[in-house]
C-alpha cells in the first residue's frame, strides 16, 4: 500500500466526510445556492493572498517539480482564479488576513506552521486535501457531468480540470509516498496526523460555507466579509 493510501485509511470516515461534504454533494446535484457557493469563494481570497508555498521552497528536493509548479500557480492564482471575480463586490479588504473567518484563518495558520516546522513530506500531507481538488472536483465533474450548476460554479470547477492542477496533485502525492517510504515510524505517524488535521480544517471551511456562518468568539452578530 502506498503511503498516501495509508494516510487516507488513517483519516478513515473523516476523509469520506470531506469527499461527500453536503456542500460538495449539493454542487454535484446542481442544488448549491449562490450564497453558499460564494461564501466559500470569498473566504478563499485571504488564502490566495498568502505566500505559504514560498516558505517551503528550501525544503523541496531537486528532483521534485513542486516548487516549479507552485511558482507558476502563484502567478495563475493572482490573475485567473475565479474567486477574484468577487472582488468588485466585496472589495480588496477581502484579500487581507483580517477578512478570514475562524475556519479559514485556522487552516492558513495550520499550513504556515507546518511549512515552518515540518519536512517537505509533512507539508505535502498537510496541503494534500487542497492540492487534490483536481480529483475531488475536476475528475468527478468529468465523470458525472452534472447539470444545473450556475455559470460561475462551472467556471470554478473547470479550473480543476486543467492538467496543470493534476500535475500539482501528482507531485504532492509523489512526495508523500517518497517520504513515507524512507522516513522513521515517528515521522510517518506525524505525517498521518497532518493529513488528518488538514482534512478536518478543510471540512471546517466547507461547514462554514454550508451554514453561512463562522463567528469569531465574542463577536455577537457576525460582521465583516460574508459574515452570516
Q: Residue ranges of each PLM-predicted region?
A:
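Alpha-helical bundle segments that constitute or directly flank the non-heme di-iron/ferroxidase center
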Residues: 12-17, 31-60, 122-136, 206
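Hydrophobic alpha-helical segments
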Residues: 1-2, 8, 110-111, 120, ...
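Long amphipathic all-alpha helical oligomerization modules
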Residues: 164-196, 207-210
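Active-site-proximal alpha-helical scaffolds that flank and shape metal-associated catalytic sites
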Residues: 6, 42, 65-167, 200
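Short alpha-helical hairpin
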Residues: 8-34, 49-51, 173-182
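Short, charged, low-complexity loops and linkers
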Residues: 1-3, 26-39, 116-118, 150-159, ...
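A non-catalytic, amphipathic alpha-helix used as a structural packing/dimerization or gating element
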Residues: 39-50, 71, 75, 190-197, ...
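Acidic, carboxylate-rich catalytic segments that either coordinate divalent cations
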Residues: 190-228
